[in-house]
Amino acid sequence: MMITLRKLPLAVAVAAGVMSAQAMAVDFHGYARSGIGWTGSGGEQQCFQATGAQSKYRLGNECETYAELKLGQEVWKEGDKSFYFDTNVAYSVNQQNDWESTDPAFREANVQGKNLIEWLPGSTIWAGKRFYQRHDVHMIDFYYWDISGPGAGIENIDLGFGKLSLAATRSTEAGGSYTFSSQNIYDEVKDTANDVFDVRLAGLQTNPDGVLELGVDYGRANTTDGYKLADGASKDGWMFTAEHTQSMLKGYNKFVVQYATDAMTTQGKGQARGSDGSSSFTEELSDGTKINYANKVINNNGNMWRILDHGAISLGDKWDLMYVGMYQNIDWDNNLGTEWWTVGVRPMYKWTPIMSTLLEVGYDNVKSQQTGDRNNQYKITLAQQWQAGDSIWSRPAIRIFATYAKWDEKWGYIKDGDNISRYAAATNSGISTNSRGDSDEWTFGAQMEIWW
C-alpha cells in the first residue's frame, strides 16, 4: 500500500503534464506545391496564360514553388466560449536552385473569439490579418470573392433564416495620393489606404440541398488629410454577389452572378483599386531643377459583369470531375476594358484508391475593348498521379505531367508617349506590343501538391 501511495504523486504529475500538453497543442496547417519541369524547345518549364486573362489552368502549368505555413492555437476556452490565435506565413520562389532566398509574406495574424456575445450565440468576432471567407475556383486558382487583409468583423450571426457576417478590411496602394502645389505638379506622394466594407447573408435555403449566399461590398480610397487623388483616379465602387451552391453527386455546383462598379472592377473580387491609377514622372530642366508631375493616366470608372459556374462531382466509383465556365465583361469609360470567357474540365480516372490519371482541357478567349481584337489559348495536360485517397480533392499528391498549349493573340499591353497603358494589334516582332502572337509549346515535368 505504501508503494502505491508513493506512485500516486508521480501519476498525478504525469497526467497533469499530458493534459497541459494537450491544452497547449499547436495546430499546424498549410499548403505547398513544388516541382521540376522542362520546355520542349529547351530550357526550364514555361507556363501559359492568355494575355488579358486573370487566371490560367493550373494542372501541369505552375512554374513556382509556393508554400503557406499556418500555426494556430485555441489559447482559451471556458464552456462554449473560446479564443483562437491564427497565423500564416507564405513563401514563393522560382524553383531554379537549391538555395533561393525570398522575403516571406506575413499573410495572417488574427484572433477569433467564439460565442463571446451572450445575445448572439454562435457568432464569432475577430480582428487582425485574415483570409476572410474566400471564394475561388481551384482548377484555375481564381479568387472571385476575396477581401482578405488586415481587418475586423463579426460573422455567423444566426438570424433564423440565414447567417449574417459583417467585416471591414484594407488594401493599400503605393503612390496613390499627392499633395499638389499647382494643377498637376505635386510635392509629395503617399500610399493610399483602400477600405472595404463587406456584408454577407449566407445559408439561405432555396431548394432541397441548395443554399444561397448574398453579399455587398463597398470599397473606397481613404486619403490622408492634405493629400488628394489625381484627377481621373477612381475613388470608390461597389460589388454585388449572389452565389447558389447545390450539393449533388457527392460534390457541389456553384452558380455565381457578380456586378461591380468603378474602383471595384479592376480586381473584381471585392478589393478596391484605382487610387494609384495616376502614375508620376519627373522632368529635369536645363538648370537642374526637377519638377514632379502626376499624370492623368488610367482610371477604372465603369462596370464589370461576371457569370460563373463551377463545381466538383463524382461520376461513379472510378470517375471524378472538376469543371468551370465563366463569362466576364469589364466595360471601362477609357475603353481599356476586356471581355473574357473561359471553359474547362478536369476528369480523373481512378485506377486504384491511390493512383489516378487526370486530363485537363481549358480554353480562354479575351477581347480588347479598345481594338475589338481577341486573344485565345487552349491548353491540354495529361497527368499520372499518386494521391492520399480516391477523391479528386485528395492530397498530398505526386504527379508527372505533359502539357501542350497553343495560342493566337491579336493584341497586347503597351504604353504610349504619355506613359498611358494602351492596346495595339499584335506584331510578329514583339517589339511594339507584349502580345505573344501565334504559336504553341509543350512542357513536361513532375510536381507535388499538398494541403493539410
Curated annotation (Swiss-Prot):
The chain crosses the membrane at residues 27-35, 65-78, 81-93, 105-115, 123-130, 149-159, 162-173, 192-205, 210-222, 235-248, 251-263, 301-315, 318-333, 337-351, 354-369, 373-388, 396-410, 437-451. It is found in: Cell outer membrane. Residues 36-64, 94-104, 131-148, 174-191, 223-234, 264-300, 334-336, 370-372, 411-436 are extracellular. InterPro entries: G_neg_Bact_CarbUptk_Porin, Maltoporin, Porin_LamB, Porin_LamB_sf. Residues 26, 79-80, 116-122, 160-161, 206-209, 249-250, 316-317, 352-353, 389-395, 452 are periplasmic. It is a multi-pass membrane protein. GO terms for molecular function: carbohydrate transmembrane transporter activity; maltodextrin transmembrane transporter activity; maltose transporting porin activity; porin activity. Induction: By maltose. Residues 1-25 form the signal peptide. Keywords: Cell outer membrane, Disulfide bond, Ion transport, Membrane, Porin, Signal, Sugar transport, Transmembrane, Transmembrane beta strand, Transport. Substrate binds at R134, H135, D136, V137, H138, M139, I140, D141, F142, Y143. It catalyses: beta-maltose(in) = beta-maltose(out). The record marks Y143 as: Important in sugar transport. One of its GO terms (biological process) is monoatomic ion transport. GO terms for cellular component: cell outer membrane; pore complex. Disulfide bonds join C47-C63. SUPFAM superfamilies: Porins. The keyword Transmembrane applies. PANTHER family: CRYPTIC OUTER MEMBRANE PORIN BGLH-RELATED. HAMAP family: LamB. Belongs to the porin LamB (TC 1.B.3) family. Homotrimer formed of three 18-stranded antiparallel beta-barrels, containing three independent channels. Involved in the transport of maltose and maltodextrins. Does not act as a receptor for phages. This is Maltoporin. The gene is lamB.
